[in-house]
Amino acid sequence: MDSQGPIILEKSIKIEEVIKIANTSIIDIVTKTVTPEIKAPYELVDVEYDKMGSDYILSILVDKEGGITVEDTSDLTNIISPLLDTIDPDPFPNQYMLEVSSPGLERPLKTADSLKAAVGSYINVSLYQAIDKVKVFQGDLLAFDGETLTIDYLDKTRHKIVNIPYQAVAKVRMAVKL
């Protein structure tokens, strides 16, 4: 029997891709941990984990009907911070700063329900692959049936309608119409 040792498959992965994969895992763990504890009237909008300069920032974006106050963010920080300390094993490779805040005017739309609620709103949609040579659309969300977003957007001076398959969407957020 011929023994050649282990087979090593080489794949070139950029460090940015490795960091993105690790950050996705951290985001998933944090989301699963904090979601059950963020109760009505609050809604968890998004969890982000990014490096800014030499610091790591864990941002938890929360909203409620009528908007979130500074007191709300303080109360939520007091709930969330101890929860993060209970995660075992600790998913954070470095110390981080916790930031609990409002998602702001350009809030991300992460779920099908948030897209359905946004029908009639002005949005920004980034795609994995271009449709008709366009990778980012910004316009009014006319409809969303769970599978397709219908957007009225301005192409130079003409209004156009585009139907975008939901699985083609990389990122969606509210946008400010100027």
Swiss-Prot record:
Record keywords, A-Z: Cytoplasm, Ribosome biogenesis
Q: What does this protein do?
A: Required for maturation of 30S ribosomal subunits.
Q: Which CDD domains match?
A: YlxS_C
Entry similarity comment: Belongs to the RimP family.
Chief localization class? cytoplasm
Which gene specifies this protein's sequence? rimP
* Protein's GO biological process: ribosomal small subunit assembly; translation
Q: Supply the name of the protein.
A: Ribosome maturation factor RimP
- Which Pfam family, just one, is annotated for this protein? RimP_N
Out of the domains of life, which is the source? Bacteria
The record's subcellular location field reads: Cytoplasm
Would you tell me the Gene Ontology cellular component terms? Answer: cytosol
Q: Which InterPro entries match?
A: Ribosome_maturation_RimP, RimP_C, RimP_C_sf, RimP_N, RimP_N_sf
Species the sequence originates in: Streptococcus pyogenes serotype M1
